[in-house]
Each structure stands twice: as C-alpha cells, then as structure tokens.
Swiss-Prot record:
Belongs to the globin family. GO terms for biological process: hydrogen peroxide catabolic process. Keywords: Heme, Iron, Metal-binding, Oxygen transport, Transport. The keyword Transport applies. This is Hemoglobin subunit alpha-A. O2 binds at H58. Involved in oxygen transport from the lung to the various peripheral tissues. InterPro entries: Globin (IPR000971), Globin-like_sf (IPR009050), Globin/Proto (IPR012292), Hemoglobin_a-typ (IPR002338), Hemoglobin_oxygen_transport (IPR050056), Hemoglobin_pi (IPR002339). Signal peptide: none annotated. GO terms for molecular function: haptoglobin binding; heme binding; iron ion binding; organic acid binding; oxygen binding; oxygen carrier activity; peroxidase activity. Transmembrane segments: none annotated.
C-alpha cells in the first residue's frame, strides 16, 4: 500500500520522467532484453536493435501507462484494467516480466536522476512499480 509520502515521492520523480517517456522507456526495454534475454520471446516481430523505432514506440507506451497510473495513483487498478486484460488474455505475458521491466526502469531513473532518487524516493518508486505489476498480473488468476 502506498502511503501519502510514497504517492508524493512518486509524483515528484515522475515530473522529471514525464518529458522523457520514449527515451527512458526504450532504455528500460533494451536493458531488460539484454539482461533477461528470455523476455525477447514476446517481441518476435520487433527489430530489437539499439534505437529501433519499435523499441522506442513501445517504450513510450510503457512510460505513458506509468504516467497514467501516477495521474490516477488512488485508482491504479481501474486505470490499468484494460492493459491488464490485454497482457493476461491476449498477449499472455509471463507475470515475472513486469517485475523485471520495473527493475530495469528503476536503473534507468537512477542513471538519469541520481540526486533525485534518494533512498526514500527509490523505495517509493519501487513500491509503485510493484503495485503496477500486481495490477497487471491480477487478471491471470
């Protein structure tokens, strides 16, 4: 459960992230594909080379969904319901991949905003990403 302080920390760090959705999303995806090669299996139709338009486009979608969740932080479940359906029923993405992508996203934020990612903000952002992952995997059960 996100506390009031967590919500403020997440909203604060996302003011720095929002203008870089495509860049940060693509970096997180590329990092995930390199670190966890098995995740590539969900993207057989993508050009997975560095800087590809498909990775940039999907990265932008990922971060846009996170921004939408931040904008509706008190109703992440309702906000991401359709996305949860898509990933559970149509795409059938292994739930562990949301955690892997979340970890990679945290690394990207740390690289670009080291001074803003204090231990408290890091913990809050991690809790938020875990909450998003929980929502996205809820329909698997």
């Amino acid at each position: 459960v996100l506390s009031a302080a967590d919500k403020n920390n997440v909203k604060g760090i996302f003011t720095k992230i929002a203008g870089h959705a495509e860049e940060y999303g693509a970096e997180a995806l590329e990092r995930m594909f390199i670190t966890y090669p098995s995740t590539k299996t969900y993207f057989p139709h993508f050009d997975l080379s560095h800087g590809s338009a498909q990775i940039k486009g999907h990265g932008k979608k990922v971060v846009a969904a996170l921004i939408e969740a931040v904008n509706h932080i008190d109703d992440i479940t309702g906000t991401l319901s359709k996305l949860s359906d898509l990933h559970a029923h149509k795409l059938r993405v292994d739930p562990v991949n949301f955690k892997l992508l979340g970890q990679c996203f945290l690394v990207v934020v740390a690289i670009h905003h080291p001074s803003a990612l204090t231990p408290e903000v890091h913990a809050s952002l991690d809790k938020f990403l875990c909450a998003v992952g929980t929502v996205l995997t809820a329909k698997y059960r």
